[in-house]
Amino acid sequence: MKPGAPPIATPLLDTLQRGLAELDAQGLRRVRRTADTACDAHMRVDGRDIVGFASNDYLGLAAHPALVAAFAEGAQRYGSGSGGSHLLGGHSRAHARLEDELAGFAGGFSDAPRALYFSTGYMANLAAMTALTGKQATIFSDALNHASLIDGIRLSRANVQIYPHADMHALGALLDASDAPTKLIVSDTVFSMDGDLAPLAELVALAERHGAWLVVDDAHGFGVLGPQGRGALAAAALRSPNLVYVGTLGKAAGVAGAFVVAHETAIEWMIQRARSYIFTTAAPPAVAHAVSASLKVIGGDEGDARRAHLAALIERTRALLRATRWQPVDSHTAVQPLVIGSNDATLAAMRALDARGLWVPAIRPPTVPAGTSRLRISLSAAHSFDDLARLEAALIAASEASA
């Protein structure tokens, strides 16, 4: 632009500003909070001490001394970064070892399991949806699947059939009517906003009956469900050659990243064709080194003790939520939603809890359907029963004030 020339009009900024104003008017603008300390049940956030019910740190491992030490050890050994993509110099011994460990830990459903490590769960789901399908495939997706699965499905160029949430009769009818040469059924195991479990045994049976593959996203089950925390498939004692298992490592595992476990041939194909694996820098090896330490805790006696404590917290929370004037969702997992309804009422409840030093996030559209805004209470083995007593008193007071 020449000196002195008038500025070029930027209608995009005007459009964005109007969009932000609309979000404000609808009570839908999201605001980040800043943690000053490590992720834990008791934290300092935005300069205030709080009890946090917002994280997905289900086993309370994010600040575990063994994991912190392993992270530091990994950085000393491998440096701070990987230096490249997995196929161009960034694949370290820490990554390779972790993949072997994950295949053994979570791959009991397969006779020939292999694991592939990703930097995020979003990237892992994109890889599974895009590399294993294509224009000739049909994907059958639960209506409440996670956004990362939905985005992967959109990128896959496959035909898509959405079945009502957990409705196996409807899914069976769609499969009966399909003549696609490749069929993929896709489902979360634990649904992140309701906390309910997918009917996995029925999904596996339908997949085998129709010659379909079943991809399950166990983001909220890995580390928590099943013997030794091996996940939802292990909890249901399911085995099938047609399974693809996605797990995340930044929730119960307390570190970061994700992985896919499947038959070794499917994993080799993903290495060759999954764009979200190929065209990105590998995660720092220190992260993988810390995850290896996490698996030892998850699968050991301490992991069993943490899961037992978490189970007791879940049952206590289910009871206390029924004492409020709002609508609890029937969840037996660490995700305990409390449906309030309107955006404004949900935000008011969140602020009332915050005033008492409790961080419980408000979940609003488009994450959940309009009219079902809710508080999402996320439990951790790091919580105590005293923490729940504080939560109960605050919830009852807030619900009565809203009546």
Swiss-Prot record:
GO terms for biological process: biotin biosynthetic process. It is an enzyme of class 2 (transferase). GO terms for molecular function: 8-amino-7-oxononanoate synthase activity; pyridoxal phosphate binding. Its EC number is 2.3.1.47. Pyridoxal 5'-phosphate binds at residues 121-122, 192, 220, 248. Belongs to the class-II pyridoxal-phosphate-dependent aminotransferase family. BioF subfamily. This is 8-amino-7-oxononanoate synthase. It comes from Burkholderia vietnamiensis (strain G4 / LMG 22486) (Burkholderia cepacia (strain R1808)). The gene is bioF.
